[in-house]
């Protein structure tokens, strides 16, 4: 009887390896492209999910790609990005007709410090003074309008709003006395504090709109709901992990590395940041309504839109 050939043994071995891969053998990861306009508190959980391999555990090679807000939203709509970690801007784009949906929220409220000179002790003292924002029509502008009105001040009439640029430029405007106060996102507001200014309050204490999460296209939701659910699951699990007290050492280590903070600043940022997180991936629809109200006030839209038409939180249910 003839002995089996080496070819037969090789074929059997290959079949065996394919049927029973080695434990821990690498599986091919699916690349997803996530647009991001900034590395800040609002986008942090998507970077955290990537860097601590929450996306990888769901089978993804997550590429986070920088793009200015309008460019990133256009790329998302065109299919060049699969997802975006923009929330408020994505909802506003949907209001303007882009076929997008907010699918998960990581930050239930923004961390925008109202940074002032040390002699200013309350918001009412901003009457007759100048307040710096990033740009007219941006989210920090909306926050400024809301906070001023909340405390009985009339924007423009009582307080002059000036578009002074990014965080560095707003701090410089404070130092040069071009403005008396500025809306500055954390942890930049803490850096301004180190320059001799004071964080009077967090705008998010009264202006509670979502400011971090994940958005995608209606087409992606319809054509690949299983992928969307896995992306959302990775993001929500990362956010839960970050917020759990037993993981504080990992969370603060990450904050220190990303934002180049000293120990005391890291501790303070962590103290402010964790309560702002949404660990279940959703916010109430009245918070989405704040975005609609802001868009109406700034003239981005001319008629009211129901908040539930702008989001799809079905993917976070049951996680």
Language-model regions: role of each:
Residues 43, 52, 73, 77, ...:
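Extracytoplasmic/secreted envelope proteins and their assembly/folding machinery
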Residues 222-302:
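Secondary-structure end/capping motifs
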